[in-house]
Regions:
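Non-catalytic propeptide/linker segments at domain boundaries
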Residues: 58-60, 65-163, 346, 350-397, ...
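Aromatic-Pro/Gly-enriched surface loop or interdomain linker
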Residues: 170, 174, 185-193, 201-202, ...
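Active-site-adjacent mobile loop/cap segments within catalytic or ligand-binding domains
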Residues: 249, 254, 328-331, 348, ...
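Short beta-strand-plus-loop segments that form exposed binding edges in beta-rich domains
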Residues: 332-343
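Pro/Thr/Ser/Gly-rich low-complexity, intrinsically disordered linker/stalk tracts
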Residues: 585-627, 676-694
Length: 982
């Protein structure tokens, strides 16, 4: 800003009068200032009044769309004074968007007075995991946040069909794309910081669902049917106005004491898998604030305290757990209060996400979709007789899709929200109902609490809400990030029910935009575009009566934006920026110090030391956040085929345990501090066989998560065929491959959106990515074969000079290197995920030169090794060289020699079971190499072996597929191990 002042003093050193009131000169000055801050509209000056030393300027809203500090405002006034009056002594007032510019300084730059902060009285949180061995006092503990990813499938009445709300482009659709931030990243980050996060869409991708009602539960103690309604399992689809929480009953404890506590046990019958667990109950004036719930999942016990003074009559999320069919070790129970003053009620428990169950049909006087910023058309309510109503209902159809794909309108109906909330248009337009309802739903959640005391609702004290969208539009460079807030509500009131000014919406918007833009520029894209801070009347920004913003993160239509936006690392960074913006905004309101949760640990390894196992790891430094330093760690353990325990807290980056022989141990670690917990690191595994056949070291070298590969020329461009994203864990945004690569093809309709348009054949299921648990998968088969094993991250070998992991045949009879889809990936200036870095090559060379046995597998073990030194390593030590890419589309492998004859198949398409191999390398044997298996369609090698054990040398077997993608992985893996260990 100082440089801007100097520049314009030199240019416009004469007085305003000497310039003959040249409004254009002043306009140019202000526009230069605005362009330094954001990509926004041009400043237009409506009026300039000069009286003595007083200058008053009124402009359009452009100046209000940038983030301004107090220093910026001061310097701007001095600049205007210098231009208009010829000196800096003027008293300058500038109005933009009906605000004096000084009123637009946010708490990002300058703390507000206590009288202008949004605070709520301390209450018992809605849900608390009481098994967690940590707290987050300087995180978001005790805070409640409502948020949602945009859109979802909805029923389009004019065509009587279920449709996306946005276009299918660049392998995704906005309806699911924003969910790929909220579901795997943003919501867990907020929850790890201690927040309770409430969403108006299903959060579980599990399509199987079972709701166990209280009438199906096992009761211990004295319970009675409560007054009023409760949940009842629908006998058919939900039709217009149906509310399943008004069709049944709930139960309430009658009498209990410490010796004879009542208990209700809900036992499902489920196929083995992971399921979200939701509970429901009825809120009474004397409801317990600490109702005790226990989730028994594969024999592990996790306990929760639920504040039943809020949230009655809807689904309350506890967590996601692994269950199997053993009923004695898989159930949910709730225990009576036993304090004589408060009561516990219970209604039902829901396991899994399920399929959409709301059936819709065309209504009289339905109308076409109307944007959120526009007024709705006027229409009369048409009368319809009962016969016509029944006929219409008979034609009602469900989406036929998993519930997590559907729009918020339908989740609200299924979860007991009154139709006065979600049926905004009297059922004339589901699209409008959906976007209009989300903000009203926020107010219903907060109704009765200190956040919204005058409205009826669920009594949840919300501290903030977020509507998360992406935008449209095409540019050569980055479209970037827009934030929308509204300074008044539907009644034109500029304060929240708490009495605080809604200008705090601007503060939250500024925190979020600033954090996203700064983090993206620091890590990935120095030119990431900062767009406007818009004070605009969109329903999701206007309706909520708590601090609320609407985020338009990037353009899902723009190829440059999506080069970054399809990369899970970018989505992690942006989600972390959003989490940090909530953290900083809320702590600013309370005047307290925040601590940012750490990043996940790295360089993890398990070492066997006689009869004990030592787990080691390292903290990951966050260069952007000095408070994100770990002060403790949580070590999680899973044995055999069970579920994870609740963790053991340690203060140093090491953990030693004594394993039982014959028991498999899977270990992962999270880093913690006063701000909460990081994501869990990768899963390693260890096992000591009762009768040991040999010792194996499993090396996990598959660390890649990335977007697809892109290409472009002057006209055409897009995602390379047979190049898929590698999601983090489970991806929810991929719907199909791109088929329009012509940049000249413009958007016409969402069904004909031009450049970047894609298929949607994968829209109905998530796609498995890098699950970071492959040592456990390999270890299970090794244990069944009688081998002991430990495992390590590749970084513990390649990045730690003092690593405890060294490769020696005296320590390990066999080394199993997992490379999966590891491959150099270029994003901007970043080139990560090289298949076999030099340090790994050095370690393997040492091991093999001393007679070691090596199993190596990965889809790109040749194509990513074509540099001079890399190619020499594979040629001379591993006895293969690169032949071709895309060696198999059918996913067939024919065994030729060494292993038992047969044909194996592997996954080549995105699926919800295991990461696939879409473009395997074809290999060619070099001197001493043996073709063990081929891809029949290309007649090139899929596996190359080498056996020099007769001369006291090494033995290797190298597979050019992601071995884990094989449909019969255990058999193929076992045969590979058997041959190597002969």
């Amino acid at each position: 800003m100082q440089r801007t002042i100097l520049l314009f003093v030199l240019i416009f050193g004469m007085s305003w009068h000497a310039l003959a009131l040249d409004k254009q000169a002043l306009t140019d000055t202000l526009n230069a200032l605005v362009r330094q801050h954001a990509y926004t509209e041009s400043v237009k000056i409506h009026s300039v009044r000069v009286k003595n030393k007083y200058v008053t300027i009124r402009t359009n809203r452009a100046l209000s769309t940038i983030s301004l500090s107090a220093n910026d405002v001061r310097d701007l006034r001095l600049l205007v004074s210098q231009i208009v009056l010829g000196n800096n002594q003027g008293k300058v007032t500038i109005y933009t968007d009906d605000y004096e510019i000084g009123e637009l300084v946010t708490s990002v730059h300058q703390s507000r007075s206590k009288a202008n902060r949004y605070t709520l009285p301390t209450t018992t949180p809605w849900v608390t995991n009481t098994s967690h061995p940590y707290s987050a006092k300087q995180g978001l503990e005790g805070k409640h946040i409502a948020l949602w990813g945009s859109h979802g499938q909805y029923f389009h009445q004019p065509t009587e069909s279920w449709r996306w709300q946005r276009a299918k482009v660049w392998t995704t659709v906005e309806d699911l794309y924003t969910t790929s931030y909220t579901m795997p990243f943003l919501v867990p980050m907020l929850e790890n910081a201690g927040a309770v996060v409430v969403q108006p869409r299903e959060r579980d991708t599990q399509t199987y669902e079972q709701v166990v009602d209280d009438s199906q539960a096992t009761l211990k103690g004295q319970w009675a049917i409560g007054e009023g309604a409760g949940w009842a399992n629908p006998t058919t689809h939900l039709l217009e106005g149906d509310n399943p929480f008004t069709k049944g009953r709930y139960i309430v404890e009658v009498k209990c004491d410490e010796k004879n506590k009542g208990e209700v046990i809900y036992t499902p019958t489920l196929p083995a898998g992971e399921y979200a667990v939701y509970v429901s109950y009825n809120t009474q004036p004397n409801s317990s604030s600490k109702a005790q719930y226990t989730v028994m999942h594969k024999g592990q016990k996790t306990t929760f305290s639920v504040n039943q003074k809020m949230g009655g009559g809807t689904w309350v999320y506890l967590g996601t757990f692994a269950f199997d069919s053993d009923k004695t070790n898989n159930y949910v129970s709730v225990t009576a209060a036993a304090n004589g003053k408060e009561i516990v009620t219970t209604d039902a428990v829901k396991f899994g996400g399920g399929m959409g169950s709301v059936a819709r049909y065309k209504q009289p006087n339905s109308f076409e979709n109307v944007p959120s910023s526009k007024d709705l058309p006027e229409s009369d309510v048409a009368m319809i007789d009962s016969a016509e109503l029944l006929a219409n209902q008979a034609n009602a159809i469900t989406s036929g899709l998993p519930r997590y794909i559907e729009a918020a309108r339908y989740w609200m109906q299924y979860s007991g929200i009154p139709d006065s909330i979600y049926n905004y248009t009297d059922s004339k337009n589901d699209y409008v109902d959906d976007y209009a309802a989300r903000g009203i739903w926020v107010n219903y959640l907060a109704g009765g609490s200190a956040a919204n005391p005058k409205e009826a609702g669920l009594n949840i004290p919300l501290h903030a809400s977020l509507a998360f969208h992406t935008d449209a539009g095409v540019r050569k460079d980055v479209v970037g990030t827009l934030l929308i807030y509204k300074d008044h509500d539907d009644e034109m009131c500029k304060t929240y029910p708490t009495g605080k000014s809604r200008i705090l919406n601007r503060d939250l918007a500024d925190y979020m935009q600033t954090q996203i833009v700064e983090d993206m520029r620091a890590i990935y894209v120095p030119e990431w575009t900062r767009r406007q801070l818009n004070n605009s009347s969109y329903a999701e920004a206007r309706h909520p009566k708590v601090p609320a913003v609407l985020l338009e993160l990037l353009s899902h239509q723009n190829m440059t934006d999506m080069k970054y936006g399809l990369d899970p690392r970018v989505r992690f960074t942006i989600s972390r920026a959003m989490y940090k913006s909530f953290l900083k905004f809320i702590h600013e309101q309370y005047g307290t110090e925040y601590v940012v949760q750490p990043l996940p640990v790295n360089n993890m390894a398990i070492n066997r030391q006689a009869e004990t196992m030592k787990v080691t790891w390292q903290a990951t430094e966050d260069a952007l956040e000095p408070t994100a330093t770990p002060t403790y760690y949580i070590v999680y353990t899973r044995t055999n085929d069970g579920d994870w325990d609740n963790g053991t807290r340690v203060t140093t980056p090491a953990y030693t345990f004594t394993p039982e022989k014959g028991t498999r141990y899977d270990i992962c670690v999270a880093a913690g501090n006063a701000g909460g917990l990081s994501f869990k690191g990768e899963t390693l595994s260890a096992y000591i066989a009762p009768e040991e056949k040999g010792k194996v070291l499993i090396v996990n070298g598959f660390t890649r998560v990335s977007g697809p590969e892109w290409w472009s020329d002057s006209i055409y461009g897009g995602i390379r065929p047979m190049s898929h994203t590698v999601p983090y864990g489970k991806g929810v945004n991929y719907i199909g491959e791109v088929y329009d690569f012509d940049s000249r093809n413009a958007w016409k309709t969402d069904d004909n959106c031009g450049w970047g348009m894609c298929y949607s054949d994968h829209m109905d299921h998530p796609t498995v990515g890098n699950t970071f648990d492959y040592p456990a998968l390999h270890g299970k088969t090794l244990a069944e074969m009688g081998y002991s094993y430990v495992s390590t991250s590749v970084a513990a070998i390649t990045s730690s000079p003092d690593s405890l992991i060294t490769l020696s045949p005296q320590d390990y009879d066999l080394v199993d290197v997992i490379l999966g889809k590891q491959k150099t990936y270029i994003m901007g200036t970043d080139t990560s995920f090289h298949c076999m870095p030099a340090q790994l090559q050095h370690a393997l060379t040492h091991y093999l030169q001393h007679g070691g046995r090596l199993l190596l597998s990965g889809a790109h073990i040749a194509s990513d090794m074509q540099g001079k030194e890399d190619a020499a390593f594979t040629k001379n030590l591993l006895h293969y060289e690169f032949r071709t890419t895309n060696a198999s589309k059918t996913g067939k492998i024919r065994i030729e020699r060494q292993l038992p004859n047969g044909v194996y198949t592997f996954r080549t398409e995105p699926n919800d079971t295991m990461l696939h191999t879409e473009n395997a390398d074809g290999l060619f044997p070099t001197e001493g190499g043996i073709v063990v298996a081929r891809f029949p369609e290309a007649n090139v090698a899929a596996a190359i072996g080498h056996d020099a054990t007769a001369e006291g040398g090494s033995k290797t077997l190298c597979w050019s597929i992601m071995l884990e993608s094989a449909h019969n992985f255990p058999a193929l893996y076992q045969q590979s191990i058997n041959w190597l260990m002969k």
